[in-house]
Amino acid sequence: MNLSLRRSTSALLASSLLLTIGRGATLPFMTIYLSRQYSLSVDLIGYAMTIALTIGVVFSLGFGILADKFDKKRYMLLAITAFASGFIAITLVNNVTLVVLFFALINCAYSVFATVLKAWFADNLSSTSKTKIFSINYTMLNIGWTIGPPLGTLLVMQSINLPFWLAAICSAFPMLFIQIWVKRSEKIIATETGSVWSPKVLLQDKALLWFTCSGFLASFVSGAFASCISQYVMVIADGDFAEKVVAVVLPVNAAMVVTLQYSVGRRLNPANIRALMTAGTLCFVIGLVGFIFSGNSLLLWGMSAAVFTVGEIIYAPGEYMLIDHIAPPEMKASYFSAQSLGWLGAAINPLVSGVVLTSLPPSSLFVILALVIIAAWVLMLKGIRARPWGQPALC
C-alpha cells in the first residue's frame, strides 16, 4: 500500500469513527428528545422512530446504487454534509414531522456514507488488504458506539440539544479529512466514460439474493441482541436485573470486537471462508443456548456473550468478502447498497422478540434465533455455490 493510499484509508477510517461517535451520541436519546420536546407517547415515539429508520434504509438503497455513477469521494462529502445538516436542523425546527424527516435524512446519509466507503475500499485496495481494512473499520464502528452514548449522556444532562451539536461538530472533521487526503477512486476515473452499469443486474443475480436474505436473518439475530436480551431478562426477572445483564453483555461484546476483530478478519480468504462462516454460525448457536441457561448468573451471561460475539466477529468481514467477490467492478456501491437492506432484520427484532415473549415460553426466543442463524448459514452456502458472471464458485 503506497503512501497516498495509506493516507486515504486512514482518513476514511478516522471519518467512520467520528461519524459513528456522533450517531452513537444521539440515536439512543432520540426517544428522550421526542418525549421532552414534543410530549409524544411511547407508542407514537415507536412509530416515529420506525418510520424514520425505514425511510432512511429505503432511500439509502437508491442513493447508494446511484453512487456507482459518480465520484465516490464527492459522494461521501455530500453524504456527510447531509448528515451534519440534519442534526443542525433538528435543533432549529419546532415541528415533530420535520424532526422525523430530518432524522430519516441523518440515517439515510449515514447509510450512504457507509455503503460508499465499502465501495471505495473495494475499488482501491488489494484483495489481501480489503478484509483487513474492513475489519479495522468494523472495530472503529464499535469504538464509536462505545464512546458515543456516554458522551451523549453527559451532554444531555446539560442540554437536550447538545448531543446534536456534538454530532454536527464530529461531522466537520471527516469533511476536512476526506477533502484533503482521500484520492478519487481509480475505478471511477478509469470507467467514467464507458462503464457498464445497470440496476437490473441486481435483480438478476441469484447469489446477491441469497447473500442479502442471509444478511437479513443474521442481522435479525445479532444486530439488536442487547435489546433482545434485555426484553428477555425483563420477562424472566425484572428491570433492575436486566440493566445488570446489559451492563455485562455490552462491554464484553465491545471488548471482544475491539481486541479480536482485526486478528480474525485478516485471516479470512476465499479458501477458508466457508469453514470460518460455519464456525461463526456454531458460535452464535452456542452463545444463544448459553443465554437460555444463564438465568441469574452474570458470569454465564458474560461467557455466553463472549462466544456469541465471536460469531459476530467472523460474520462481519465474511459478509463483506462475499459481496465484494460477486459484485461487478462498476457496481460495487450498488451491491453493498443491496446488502444494507439486510439491516432491516435488526430493525424488526424488538417487535418479533416482544411477540414471542408474550405468546411463547421465554426460552423459545433463543431457540428461534438459533434456528434463524442456521437458516442464514444455509442461504449463505447457496450464495457461495452460485456462479455469478461466469466466475467460479467462491470456494
Swiss-Prot record:
<dbReference type="GO" id="GO:0071916">
    <property type="term" value="F:dipeptide transmembrane transporter activity"/>
</dbReference>
<keyword id="KW-0997">Cell inner membrane</keyword>
<feature type="transmembrane region" description="Helical">
    <location>
        <begin position="341"/>
        <end position="360"/>
    </location>
</feature>
<keyword id="KW-0813">Transport</keyword>
<keyword id="KW-0812">Transmembrane</keyword>
<dbReference type="GO" id="GO:0005886">
    <property type="term" value="C:plasma membrane"/>
</dbReference>
<feature type="transmembrane region" description="Helical">
    <location>
        <begin position="99"/>
        <end position="121"/>
    </location>
</feature>
<comment type="function">
    <text>A transporter able to export peptides. When overexpressed, allows cells deleted for multiple peptidases (pepA, pepB, pepD and pepN) to grow in the presence of dipeptides Ala-Gln or Gly-Tyr which otherwise inhibit growth. Cells overexpressing this protein have decreased intracellular levels of Ala-Gln dipeptide, and in a system that produces the Ala-Gln dipeptide overproduction of this protein increases export of the dipeptide.</text>
</comment>
<dbReference type="InterPro" id="IPR011701">
    <property type="entry name" value="MFS"/>
</dbReference>
<feature type="transmembrane region" description="Helical">
    <location>
        <begin position="298"/>
        <end position="320"/>
    </location>
</feature>
<feature type="transmembrane region" description="Helical">
    <location>
        <begin position="364"/>
        <end position="381"/>
    </location>
</feature>
<feature type="transmembrane region" description="Helical">
    <location>
        <begin position="271"/>
        <end position="293"/>
    </location>
</feature>
<keyword id="KW-0472">Membrane</keyword>
<feature type="transmembrane region" description="Helical">
    <location>
        <begin position="12"/>
        <end position="34"/>
    </location>
</feature>
<dbReference type="InterPro" id="IPR036259">
    <property type="entry name" value="MFS_trans_sf"/>
</dbReference>
<feature type="transmembrane region" description="Helical">
    <location>
        <begin position="75"/>
        <end position="94"/>
    </location>
</feature>
<dbReference type="GO" id="GO:0035442">
    <property type="term" value="P:dipeptide transmembrane transport"/>
</dbReference>
<feature type="transmembrane region" description="Helical">
    <location>
        <begin position="160"/>
        <end position="182"/>
    </location>
</feature>
<keyword id="KW-1003">Cell membrane</keyword>
<feature type="transmembrane region" description="Helical">
    <location>
        <begin position="134"/>
        <end position="156"/>
    </location>
</feature>
<keyword id="KW-0653">Protein transport</keyword>
<feature type="transmembrane region" description="Helical">
    <location>
        <begin position="208"/>
        <end position="230"/>
    </location>
</feature>
<keyword id="KW-1133">Transmembrane helix</keyword>
<keyword id="KW-0571">Peptide transport</keyword>
<dbReference type="InterPro" id="IPR020846">
    <property type="entry name" value="MFS_dom"/>
</dbReference>
<dbReference type="GO" id="GO:0015031">
    <property type="term" value="P:protein transport"/>
</dbReference>
<comment type="similarity">
    <text>Belongs to the major facilitator superfamily.</text>
</comment>
<dbReference type="Pfam" id="PF07690">
    <property type="entry name" value="MFS_1"/>
</dbReference>
<feature type="transmembrane region" description="Helical">
    <location>
        <begin position="245"/>
        <end position="264"/>
    </location>
</feature>
<feature type="transmembrane region" description="Helical">
    <location>
        <begin position="44"/>
        <end position="66"/>
    </location>
</feature>
<protein>
    <recommendedName>
        <fullName>Uncharacterized MFS-type transporter YdeE</fullName>
    </recommendedName>
</protein>
